[in-house]
Protein backbone atom coordinates (compact mmCIF):
# COMPACT_ATOMS: atom_id res chain seq x y z
CA UNK A 1 0.00 0.00 0.00
CA UNK A 2 1.43 3.37 -1.05
CA UNK A 3 0.69 6.25 1.31
CA UNK A 4 0.90 8.61 -1.67
CA UNK A 5 -2.47 7.25 -2.80
CA UNK A 6 -4.12 9.31 -0.06
CA UNK A 7 -5.68 12.65 -0.91
CA UNK A 8 -3.34 15.61 -0.24
CA UNK A 9 -5.60 17.05 2.46
CA UNK A 10 -5.46 13.78 4.40
CA UNK A 11 -1.68 13.64 4.09
CA UNK A 12 -1.59 17.16 5.51
CA UNK A 13 -3.62 16.00 8.51
CA UNK A 14 -1.17 13.17 9.09
CA UNK A 15 1.80 15.56 8.96
CA UNK A 16 1.22 16.29 12.66
CA UNK A 17 2.37 12.71 13.43
CA UNK A 18 5.91 11.43 13.46
CA UNK A 19 6.96 10.02 10.11
CA UNK A 20 6.80 6.32 11.00
CA UNK A 21 3.36 6.64 12.58
CA UNK A 22 2.06 8.77 9.72
CA UNK A 23 3.25 6.20 7.19
CA UNK A 24 1.64 3.30 9.08
CA UNK A 25 -1.64 5.17 9.48
CA UNK A 26 -1.64 6.16 5.82
CA UNK A 27 -1.15 2.57 4.70
CA UNK A 28 -4.08 1.44 6.83
CA UNK A 29 -6.27 4.21 5.42
CA UNK A 30 -5.35 3.30 1.84
CA UNK A 31 -6.15 -0.36 2.55
CA UNK A 32 -9.47 0.59 4.14
CA UNK A 33 -10.42 2.64 1.10
CA UNK A 34 -9.54 -0.15 -1.30
CA UNK A 35 -11.43 -2.82 0.66
CA UNK A 36 -14.54 -0.88 1.62
CA UNK A 37 -16.78 -2.23 -1.14
CA UNK A 38 -15.62 -5.84 -1.41
CA UNK A 39 -14.75 -6.57 2.23
CA UNK A 40 -16.07 -3.91 4.63
CA UNK A 41 -15.13 -5.95 7.72
CA UNK A 42 -11.48 -5.98 6.60
CA UNK A 43 -11.73 -2.28 5.81
CA UNK A 44 -13.03 -1.66 9.32
CA UNK A 45 -10.12 -3.60 10.80
CA UNK A 46 -7.64 -1.41 8.91
CA UNK A 47 -9.47 1.77 9.91
CA UNK A 48 -9.46 0.70 13.56
CA UNK A 49 -5.74 -0.05 13.32
CA UNK A 50 -5.22 3.50 12.05
CA UNK A 51 -7.34 4.86 14.91
CA UNK A 52 -5.26 2.93 17.45
CA UNK A 53 -2.24 4.98 16.32
CA UNK A 54 -3.91 8.34 15.72
CA UNK A 55 -7.32 8.76 17.31
CA UNK A 56 -7.19 12.57 17.14
CA UNK A 57 -7.07 12.82 13.33
CA UNK A 58 -10.44 13.64 11.74
CA UNK A 59 -9.76 11.65 8.57
CA UNK A 60 -9.01 8.55 10.63
CA UNK A 61 -12.22 8.78 12.64
CA UNK A 62 -14.12 9.40 9.42
CA UNK A 63 -12.59 6.26 7.89
CA UNK A 64 -13.68 4.18 10.89
CA UNK A 65 -17.17 5.66 10.68
CA UNK A 66 -17.58 4.98 6.98
CA UNK A 67 -16.28 1.42 7.31
CA UNK A 68 -18.59 0.77 10.26
CA UNK A 69 -21.48 2.19 8.22
CA UNK A 70 -20.74 -0.25 5.41
CA UNK A 71 -20.73 -3.05 7.99
CA UNK A 72 -24.13 -1.99 9.32
CA UNK A 73 -22.68 -1.09 12.72
CA UNK A 74 -24.83 2.01 13.03
CA UNK A 75 -23.90 2.93 16.60
CA UNK A 76 -20.16 2.84 15.98
CA UNK A 77 -20.55 4.60 12.65
CA UNK A 78 -22.59 7.38 14.22
CA UNK A 79 -20.11 7.90 17.06
CA UNK A 80 -17.10 7.99 14.72
CA UNK A 81 -18.69 10.26 12.12
CA UNK A 82 -19.74 12.70 14.83
CA UNK A 83 -16.22 12.61 16.24
CA UNK A 84 -14.81 13.37 12.79
CA UNK A 85 -17.09 16.38 12.49
CA UNK A 86 -16.06 17.67 15.92
CA UNK A 87 -12.44 17.38 14.84
CA UNK A 88 -13.09 19.54 11.79
CA UNK A 89 -13.83 17.12 8.96
CA UNK A 90 -14.91 19.00 5.86
CA UNK A 91 -16.46 15.93 4.23
CA UNK A 92 -20.22 15.91 3.58
CA UNK A 93 -21.20 13.44 6.31
CA UNK A 94 -24.73 14.58 7.13
CA UNK A 95 -26.49 11.99 4.95
CA UNK A 96 -24.46 9.17 6.49
CA UNK A 97 -25.17 10.44 10.00
CA UNK A 98 -28.89 10.70 9.24
CA UNK A 99 -28.92 7.20 7.77
CA UNK A 100 -27.24 5.87 10.92
CA UNK A 101 -30.12 7.35 12.90
CA UNK A 102 -32.49 5.42 10.64
CA UNK A 103 -30.47 2.27 11.15
CA UNK A 104 -30.78 2.71 14.91
CA UNK A 105 -34.57 2.91 14.59
CA UNK A 106 -34.77 6.69 14.93
CA UNK A 107 -36.21 7.91 11.60
CA UNK A 108 -37.57 11.06 13.26
CA UNK A 109 -34.01 12.18 13.97
CA UNK A 110 -33.01 11.53 10.36
CA UNK A 111 -35.91 13.69 9.18
CA UNK A 112 -35.00 16.41 11.68
CA UNK A 113 -31.40 16.49 10.41
CA UNK A 114 -32.67 16.81 6.85
CA UNK A 115 -34.67 19.88 7.87
CA UNK A 116 -31.81 21.65 9.61
CA UNK A 117 -29.71 24.65 8.69
CA UNK A 118 -26.75 22.54 7.61
CA UNK A 119 -28.97 20.50 5.28
CA UNK A 120 -30.25 23.68 3.65
CA UNK A 121 -26.69 24.56 2.65
CA UNK A 122 -26.14 21.31 0.74
CA UNK A 123 -26.35 21.14 -3.03
CA UNK A 124 -25.88 18.67 -5.87
CA UNK A 125 -25.22 15.04 -5.01
CA UNK A 126 -24.82 15.80 -1.30
CA UNK A 127 -28.34 17.23 -1.14
CA UNK A 128 -29.70 14.30 -3.12
CA UNK A 129 -28.11 11.74 -0.80
CA UNK A 130 -29.72 13.43 2.21
CA UNK A 131 -33.04 13.64 0.34
CA UNK A 132 -32.94 9.87 -0.19
CA UNK A 133 -32.33 9.29 3.52
CA UNK A 134 -35.10 11.68 4.56
CA UNK A 135 -37.54 9.95 2.23
CA UNK A 136 -36.49 6.62 3.69
CA UNK A 137 -37.20 8.00 7.15
CA UNK A 138 -40.71 8.97 6.08
CA UNK A 139 -41.23 5.51 4.60
CA UNK A 140 -40.03 3.96 7.86
CA UNK A 141 -42.84 5.83 9.58
CA UNK A 142 -45.38 4.63 7.02
CA UNK A 143 -45.58 8.10 5.48
CA UNK A 144 -45.09 6.96 1.90
CA UNK A 145 -46.85 9.91 0.23
CA UNK A 146 -44.60 12.30 2.13
CA UNK A 147 -41.60 10.25 1.04
CA UNK A 148 -42.65 10.64 -2.58
CA UNK A 149 -43.02 14.39 -2.11
CA UNK A 150 -39.46 14.64 -0.78
CA UNK A 151 -38.12 12.78 -3.81
CA UNK A 152 -40.23 14.70 -6.36
CA UNK A 153 -37.70 17.38 -7.28
CA UNK A 154 -36.12 18.78 -10.46
CA UNK A 155 -33.17 16.49 -9.67
CA UNK A 156 -35.27 13.63 -11.08
CA UNK A 157 -33.75 14.27 -14.50
CA UNK A 158 -33.67 11.06 -16.57
CA UNK A 159 -30.61 12.39 -18.40
CA UNK A 160 -28.46 12.17 -15.28
CA UNK A 161 -26.00 9.34 -14.69
CA UNK A 162 -23.83 8.25 -11.79
CA UNK A 163 -24.30 6.53 -8.46
CA UNK A 164 -26.26 9.30 -6.75
CA UNK A 165 -28.66 9.69 -9.67
CA UNK A 166 -29.12 5.92 -9.79
CA UNK A 167 -29.95 5.81 -6.08
CA UNK A 168 -32.33 8.76 -6.36
CA UNK A 169 -34.21 7.20 -9.27
CA UNK A 170 -34.24 3.86 -7.44
CA UNK A 171 -35.67 5.39 -4.27
CA UNK A 172 -38.33 7.16 -6.32
CA UNK A 173 -39.22 3.92 -8.13
CA UNK A 174 -39.38 1.97 -4.87
CA UNK A 175 -41.67 4.59 -3.36
CA UNK A 176 -43.95 4.53 -6.39
CA UNK A 177 -44.10 0.75 -6.07
CA UNK A 178 -45.08 1.03 -2.40
CA UNK A 179 -47.98 3.23 -3.53
CA UNK A 180 -49.13 0.64 -6.06
CA UNK A 181 -48.02 2.72 -9.06
CA UNK A 182 -46.25 -0.21 -10.68
CA UNK A 183 -46.06 1.04 -14.28
CA UNK A 184 -44.43 4.30 -13.20
CA UNK A 185 -42.14 2.39 -10.85
CA UNK A 186 -40.95 0.21 -13.73
CA UNK A 187 -40.01 3.27 -15.77
CA UNK A 188 -37.96 4.71 -12.94
CA UNK A 189 -36.25 1.41 -12.22
CA UNK A 190 -35.28 1.39 -15.91
CA UNK A 191 -33.90 4.91 -15.55
CA UNK A 192 -32.03 3.89 -12.42
CA UNK A 193 -30.47 0.95 -14.25
CA UNK A 194 -29.44 3.23 -17.13
CA UNK A 195 -27.89 5.77 -14.74
CA UNK A 196 -26.13 3.13 -12.65
CA UNK A 197 -22.70 3.11 -14.30
CA UNK A 198 -21.03 1.78 -11.14
CA UNK A 199 -23.40 -1.02 -10.20
CA UNK A 200 -24.55 0.44 -6.87
CA UNK A 201 -28.17 -0.73 -7.18
CA UNK A 202 -30.05 -3.88 -8.17
CA UNK A 203 -32.29 -1.89 -10.50
CA UNK A 204 -31.87 -4.36 -13.34
CA UNK A 205 -33.18 -7.17 -11.14
CA UNK A 206 -36.14 -5.03 -10.08
CA UNK A 207 -36.92 -4.36 -13.74
CA UNK A 208 -36.94 -8.11 -14.41
CA UNK A 209 -39.34 -8.64 -11.52
CA UNK A 210 -41.79 -6.01 -12.75
CA UNK A 211 -41.55 -6.46 -16.52
Regions found by a protein language model. Give the residues of each.
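Structural motif corresponding to the intra-repeat A-B loop/turn of tetratricopeptide repeats
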Residues: 36-38, 71, 104, 141, ...
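Alpha-helical segment of the N-proximal tetratricopeptide repeat
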Residues: 16-52, 63, 69
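Structural register within alpha-helical repeat arrays
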Residues: 31, 63-64, 97, 134, ...
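TPR/TPR-like (Sel1-like) alpha-helical repeat modules
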Residues: 87-90, 119-120, 149-156, 180-201, ...
Amino acid sequence: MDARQLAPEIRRELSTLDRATADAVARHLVAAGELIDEDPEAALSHARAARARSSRIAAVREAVGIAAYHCGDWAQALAELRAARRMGSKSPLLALIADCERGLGRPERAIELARGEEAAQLSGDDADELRIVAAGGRADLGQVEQALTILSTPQLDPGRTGSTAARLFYAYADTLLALGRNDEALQWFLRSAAADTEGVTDAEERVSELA
